[in-house]
């Protein structure tokens, strides 16, 4: 939730005259809202972030993910590639379904974006970040951190039918795995 501050604080931080601040408001350069009493409150944090004045050290992030522990070799290959090509970037690893939006690493990445700490996120493929909701994550990174997502390998363009078919198969695989996992757990409990 944005933090709004009084005019005095904005004037001190930006070192501008109050008339300049009003002109900025009129031009839509700074977000403002009025209290019930008619006082102006400004979203200084957003203004500083949007104009690169927030002084936060932004990081590059390499996000690596595989669906299961059986694919740990693929995860290690992703990490190796990222370490070689992006040595100064922080690496976040996840093991879990691309449909699961509560992965520890993904939540860490989103929190960093909301805190304005990300300059760029690098993933090998778009679906490594998320099978669904990629555009929302991209929007969060852009809006809160003024960052971007870089996809190293882009898949060939799919027709809408191919994309929907692939998505449905992925969803079915996740739920079949859940059902089989529950059955397996029940069998182990009986033994």
Curated annotation (Swiss-Prot):
Coiled coil residues, start to end: 65-91
BP terms from Gene Ontology: DNA integration; regulation of DNA-templated transcription
Recorded GO MF terms: DNA binding; DNA strand exchange activity
Domain annotation Resolvase/invertase-type recombinase catalytic: ranges: 59-191
Keyword presence, Magnesium: no
DNA-binding span(s): 11-30
Active site, UniProt feature: 67
Top-level taxonomic group: Viruses
Keywords: Coiled coil, DNA integration, DNA recombination, DNA-binding
UniProt-listed SUPFAM superfamilies: Putative DNA-binding domain, Resolvase-like
PANTHER family reported in the protein's UniProt record: PTHR36172, RESOLVASE-RELATED (PTHR36172:SF1)
Family according to the record: Belongs to the site-specific recombinase resolvase family.
Official protein name in the record: Putative resolvase L103
């Amino acid at each position: 939730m944005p933090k709004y501050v009084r005019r005095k604080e904005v004037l001190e931080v930006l070192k501008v005259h109050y008339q300049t601040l009003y002109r900025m408001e009129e031009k839509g350069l700074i977000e403002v809202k009025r209290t019930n009493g008619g006082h102006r409150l400004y979203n200084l944090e957003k203004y500083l972030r949007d104009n690169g004045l927030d002084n936060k050290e932004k990081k590059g992030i390499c996000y690596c993910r595989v669906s299961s522990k059986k694919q740990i070799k693929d995860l290690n290959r992703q990490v190796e590639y990222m370490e070689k090509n992006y040595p100064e970037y922080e690496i976040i690893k996840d093991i879990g379904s691309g449909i699961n939006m509560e992965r520890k690493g993904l939540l860490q990445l989103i929190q960093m974006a909301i805190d304005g700490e990300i300059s760029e996120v690098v993933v090998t493929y778009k679906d490594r970040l998320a099978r669904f909701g990629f555009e929302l994550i991209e929007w969060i990174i852009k809006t809160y951190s003024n960052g971007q997502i870089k996809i190293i390998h882009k898949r060939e363009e799919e027709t809408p039918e191919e994309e929907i078919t692939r998505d449905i198969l992925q969803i079915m695989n996740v739920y079949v795995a859940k059902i089989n996992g529950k059955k397996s757990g029940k069998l182990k409990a009986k033994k």
